[in-house]
Structures are given as C-alpha cells and as structure tokens.
Amino acid sequence: MEKFEEISEKHKSRQQYFVYPLLFQEFLYTFAHDYGLNDSEPVEILSCNKKKFSSLLVKRLIIRMYQQNFWINSVNHPNQDRLLDYKNYFYSDFFSQILSEGFAIVVEIPFSLREFFCPKEKEIPKFQNLRSIHSIFSFLEDKFLHLHSLSHIEIPYPIHLEILVQLLQYHIQDVPSLHLLRFFLNYYSNWNSFITSIKSFFLLKKKNKRLFRFLYNSYVSEYEFFLLFLRKQSSCLPLASSGGFLERIHFSRKMEHFGIMDPGFFRKTLWFFMDPLMHYVRYQGKAILASKGTLFLKKKWKWYLVNFCQYSFSFWTQPRRIHLNQLANSCFDFLGYLSSVPKSTLLVRNQMLENSFLIDTQMTKFDTIVPATLLIGSLSKAQFCTGSGHPISKPIWTELSDWDILDRFGRICKNLFHYHSGSSKKRTLYRLKYILRLSCARTLARKHKSTVRTFMQRLGSVFLEEFFTEEEQVFSLMFTKTTLFYFRGSHSERIWYLDIIRINGLVNPRN
C-alpha cells in the first residue's frame, strides 16, 4: 500500500503553472476560435449555422471581467439561464461560449508544458502510425486469437462535478482557474447533485466540446492510471505465491498417499495461479478487457472494477455495464465494427503410405464486419434515406451548386469506404454507396425539377466517378486488364489504413 501511495504522489505532483492571467488577453480567444475551426467535424455532418467571432465583443468581455461584480453576480445567480444576467441573450450566449473555449485552452497549458519540458532521456519514441485508429485492430488481430474470455466495459459517466475538480487539483494549483472551472460546471448544471440527467450532461458536451473532452480525458486518465498500476501488481501474484503453491503441491501429495486426494483439486489450483494474460483496449467511453483466464477469474475482476469505481471515485457503477462473454461465441461492437473470433473447421487430407485419412483442424480468425443497421440508421438520421434504407433527397442542400452537391456526397461515400475498408464483407458498403448515389441523384433532380433518370443520363460517367472510392482506384490501377478480380476477390480483402486518426461521424452520431 505504501508503494501504491508513493507512485500515486509521483504521478500527481507536477510543476505548477499559473495561467489564470491569460484569460485577460485578447489573443487567447482568437487562438481558441481558430483552433476550433481547424478541429471541427467534417462539413457534411455539421449544420450550416456558425457563430461568428467578434473581437469587439471579446474586448467588451475582458473589460467586464476586470469589474469587481462580474463573478459575484454570476455566483449569486447560478440558476439563471443567462450568463451574468445579461439582458441580450445573444451577448450572454456569446460571452459564455467564448469564455469557456478560452478557459479550455488555459487549463490544457500545464499538461502541454509538462510534455515540452520532459527530459530527453525519458522521452518515448513517437510512431505516427500508432496514432491511427486502424492500428488498434492490428493489435486485436494479433492478441485476441489466443484469448478465451472478453469483458465489454462501458466506462461510468457522468461523474460528480466536485470529483472532477479534485482530480485537476493534483495537476493545477492555480486556485482562480479551479474556481472558474467550478463556475462553468455550476452554469451548465445544478451543483448540488450528480449529473445523472442526460440533458444536463449533453448540454455541457454540446456547448463546449473542447472543455468536455479535457474533463473527460482527465477523469479517464486518472481511472486508467490506478487500474494499470493494480493490474501490474496483480500480474506478479503468481510469482509471489509460488512458495505457497509448492507447499500446496507437497501437501496434496501427502493427501494422495493416504488415499483421500480429490482428482480435480490439483488442476483447479493450477489454473487459479496462472497468469491471466490480460489486454486492455479503450476508445472514447468503451473499453475491452480480454483474458486467457477462466470465467471465475473474470467475474472476480468484474466486481473488482465495480468496487474500484465506488471507493476511488465515489461513483456507483452498475454491474450491467460490464458484460462477460466467451470470445469464441460472441461478437463485440467497437469503433464502428462488429468484431468476433469465430472457430472454423478445416478438413485436411493426410496421405501416409497407402492409407489416407481426413483430419479436422480448428482454426480461429479475427473477423470484422460493418453493422448495416447502425449505419443505415445514421444515414436516416442525416436525412439521406428512410429508416428502411430507401434513398431520399436532401432538400437543405438544393441551394448549393451542382458541383458542391456532388462533392459532398462523394466525400461522404469515400470516407465511409476509407474507414470501413477493414471489413471482411463489403456488400453492406456497396449498399450504402447505392443509397448515397441515388440520394445525390434525387437531390440534383429536385433542384432542377427533373427526373432521376434524365439527370443520370445527362451526367453519365462523371456522376459515377465522384463515387469511385480510393480502394477501387488502387485496384483498378493494379489490375487494369483483370477487372473481375476486384469484384470477386476484394469482398473479403481487408485493408487497414494508418492515416485515420478520427472515427467517422456517421459511425457514432451520439458522440
């Protein structure tokens, strides 16, 4: 326990930086606004309504922040919908938005400086390819073939607001910044309760994604730090218990000598002391804990995680958030793919002299497919098709030029194919491609008050080339003379791209 506290203090004790005065600098809000534009979601997912940046309003905000009653009035009226009880809703909403964006930049500075001043001998080599989301599947394919059980974990959220502030106190000792953080959390929800309301939780997430991501990542990093430490300690249990294990073998031999030995006693004890070979993978709010251990050991880890969240973060984790399954008989939804490790039987004919016989060989393969229902539901929510997958026009885009409409539909199609190129069955992708292509044709026909057939005949091959994906272009260049190879062989060919650093917006529309 003393070692645990020592490592915990080293993890929490960092050089502190006082960054609160930066909130009174105009360049900070300009930088936050420009950074938000560069880090925005793809244009086809966002709405057309964008808030404009005004340097004049930023100067007015800084002047008001110098006033003594600026924060006092805000704290005394926490239940009001408008920031600072401003009469004009536009000004109130703009001030709260731009101030929260600037604050999100400020609280990230100590963490950025910590990496900047990291000693060179302790620097970890950075591999750009490992940033890709698809690199995770290469890891899963390499490790999961030898494992037995799987725990699908939904990381508990939301968490009590005061715990979020306490977690940041270990890294940021800038007291005014922490008070300002309490002010923002108090503004978005009721301070005296848990954020158990889905409406309050998603309000903070919608209003300021950058601040929400920072708070959530701080919470998850603290959660994983303690979890990883205890996991490393538990991996040493087989070595630490070797002495007792040998004594137990010696004692069991004595019992066997007297004729009262249980045949299954030794085997069960051996499995209990084996290293479980656990692997942990997380992205956003979902995590996977795979192991080679028994189901009994996985149940112990399940209740350990429940108690860990309860006593370390004062948060009650429902056991139903952790699902235990056998890896060979189940599939799990992760990063927009339905992954599984099925067992298949392969018949091998063996010839030995004059005799021949068949041998049944079981093989395991890491399989990834595209969830058709989920993607069609996302396209339906984005108004590209109906709930049953019937393509419809998108009226909101009829005001754009023909080239912009073709470009938007083409980029959506290419992004879907690019992200889901690791699917072993691509028929679902071809169905989505058909939906987007026909939806584009209906949108153009609606704009020009024509029929779909007439517009398709007018555009011809130009219309089809806009939906020609990168994967198809590669295969068409490699096999120009044998075009049938692509249509026959590439349905099961999986391609993992190492340049994808963001999950597709249509895959997870709730995040």
Swiss-Prot record:
GO terms for cellular component: chloroplast. It is found in: Plastid, Chloroplast. GO terms for biological process: mRNA processing; RNA splicing; tRNA processing. It holds the Pfam family MatK_N. PANTHER family: MATURASE K. HAMAP family: MatK. This is Maturase K. It comes from Brachypodium sylvaticum.
